[in-house]
Amino acid sequence: MASEQERNKAVVRRLVDEVLNGGNLDTVDELYAPKLAAEARAWIAPFLASFPDTRMEIIDLVAERDRVAARFVCSGTHTGEWLGHAPTGRRFERIDEAGFYRIREGRIVESWGVEDTLRRLEQLGLR
């Protein structure tokens, strides 16, 4: 039987594989607590619309008790409006990101993250 930490890491892996890389927004409802699902969709859907070929790669995934910390690199092509910027058609590559999640009963109940938005803007020619 998998430990609580392994089960919690599996939730984050599904978020990356099925939602962020796979574009399956229906999975958001399975992975997030009901009160957070709409909030998650509010940032995921527009991001995937702007960068439909998004690829997140998990570099590190660490779990302790009900918490999971993840380090990612993200790549994608800017084909839709993003942060008020018209599509450039340019790619960004290997942008560093980190996500932190609290998981209860197999669902994300709290999440927050940081990303290198300046580097993404620079690679897209927007800064």
Segment roles from a protein language model:
Residues 1-127:
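C-terminal and inter-domain tail/linker signature
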